[in-house]
From Swiss-Prot:
This is Apolipoprotein D. PROSITE patterns: LIPOCALIN. Homodimer. Disulfide bonds join 28-134, 61-185. One of its GO terms (biological process) is negative regulation of protein import into nucleus. Glycans are attached at residues 65, 98. Residues 1-20 form the signal peptide. One of its GO terms (molecular function) is cholesterol binding. Pfam families: Lipocalin_2 (PF08212). The keyword RNA-binding does not apply. Keywords: Disulfide bond, Glycoprotein, Lipid-binding, Pyrrolidone carboxylic acid, Secreted, Signal, Transport. The gene is Apod.
Length: 189
């Protein structure tokens, strides 16, 4: 009984200390991904338009650049302008985890960390992309992340509404989504 109470207290602590993270009871949902996904069309620069806040992203002017590697995987280079004015960047590698579902990628930024899901739920390749990531912990709860990306620093409101409708129709909570400030950003990619 004491062990269970300690576990529940630890779990409650996780929920309260992970400011901005989107924790939910139960396993991750499994929304449909972009049909006939073409990774080559997806390559290039994307600007972060909106997101569910993530502890590993604290800045503004967030951009990602995807390029094809010699081994067939995708190099991921994320950059942001931190609150103190310095530019932070992290480089990772993404790969398609299942050939029959090419829009389901896995991305890894650090060798000792397990890869994280990176699912492209929707994209037209030229204007917008909707990315979803979710990890289940202990079969009891999950944490998810959402990114709305654009080829330009801003997307029309109707496009953002369309993408958010995809999320809500698949049971993904958008309440905590925030807009990423892309104003007065340096061109650092």
């Amino acid at each position: 009984m004491v062990t269970m109470l300690m576990f529940l207290a630890t779990l409650a602590g996780l929920f309260t200390t992970a400011k901005g993270q989107n924790f939910h009871l139960g396993k991750c949902p499994s929304p449909p991904v972009q049909e006939n996904f073409d990774v080559k069309k997806y390559l290039g620069r994307w600007y972060e338009i909106e997101k569910i806040p993530a502890s590993f992203e604290k800045g503004n002017c967030i951009q990602a650049n995807y390029s094809l590697m010699e081994n067939g995987n995708i190099e991921v280079l994320n950059k942001e302008l931190s609150p103190d004015g310095t530019m932070n960047q992290v480089k990772g590698e993404a790969k398609q985890s299942n050939v029959s579902e090419p829009a389901k990628l896995e991305v890894q930024f650090f060798p000792l960390m397990p890869p994280a899901p990176y699912w492209i739920l929707a994209t037209d390749y030229e204007n917008y992309a909707l990315v979803y990531s979710c990890t289940t912990f202990f079969w009891l709860f999950h944490v998810d992340f959402v990114w709305i990306l654009g080829r330009n620093p801003y997307l029309p409101p109707e496009t953002i509404t369309y993408l958010k409708d995809i999320l809500t129709s698949n049971g993904i909570d958008i309440e905590k989504m925030t807009t990423t400030d892309q104003a007065n950003c340096p061109d650092f990619l």
